[in-house]
Amino acid sequence: MRDRLPDLTACRTNDDGDTAVVIVEKDHFMDGFFHQVEEIRSSIARIAQHVEDVKKNHSIILSAPNPEGKIKEELEDLDKEIKKTANRIRGKLKSIEQSCDQDENGNRTSVDLRIRRTQHSVLSRKFVDVMTEYNEAQILFRERSKGRIQRQLEITGRTTTDDELEEMLESGKPSIFISDIISDSQITRQALNEIESRHKDIMKLETSIRELHEMFMDMAMFVETQGEMVNNIERNVVNSVDYVEHAKEETKKAIKYQSKARRKKWIIAAVAVAVIAVLALIIGLSVGK
């Protein structure tokens, strides 16, 4: 539990009640912000786990000629959950962005605003990274599914080019494309079912990829525009570290030079005392004579 004593003390000792309230409310505002940051982090981590589960289901589906319907249902549920969570995250990130814009010339301190801007940029980058991984997994699954269709067609004696296969996929009607080989005794019902099943999988993927495109581009463009700000922060941190290290070295040199100068002063003083003593001795002897 966070220590609230400083806040309570500020409220008690401050004669201006309004000022005390502002301090507490401001603290509460940042507490709420950091709570929201943790929620977004958890949601991004949950999407990352879902993406790993999606990849596993993709592998299972690709390894079986006719995978169980349960696996495909689970895959659809994962896709829906990822999109729902992603839309929620995007909404929260946009809300933070709008809040920062409103407070740009408001009453919030520059420190608080920089913290919120930085956290927003970091979370946006993480979000885009995990959604990029999800998008790449879908594209890979599409290509591998397309390869399975092509191999099944080759088994029937029907050689297809990539352009022809893409034309079939875009038409959405595989039955027209393979109608001339259905009567061929060389094709098995299992092979035909797999071709149609893979085609349906690809059609669902096309829809999913289109739905994600707008969201992905929106966040990717934001991260690109905010990237320079994050880079500037990183450069400032590095420069600060370099400056501190340089200052340490200069301090060491100054101490070293100061020590040498102090040592020289003591030597000069000792020599001066010795000279004075010798002169005094000579003068004393001269007077004695």
From Swiss-Prot:
Membrane-related topology note: Single-pass type IV membrane protein
Keyword flag rRNA-binding: no
The family this protein is said to belong to: Belongs to the syntaxin family.
Keywords tagged on the record: Coiled coil, Membrane, Transmembrane, Transmembrane helix
Cellular component annotations (GO), alphabetically ordered: cell surface; cell-cell junction; cytoplasmic vesicle; membrane raft
Reported function: Essential for epithelial morphogenesis. May mediate Ca(2+)-regulation of exocytosis acrosomal reaction in sperm.
Molecular function GO labels: calcium-dependent protein binding; SNAP receptor activity
Coiled-coil ranges (or none): 68-101
Complexes and interactors: Interacts with SYT6 and SYT8; the interaction is Ca(2+)-dependent.
Name recorded for this polypeptide: Syntaxin-2
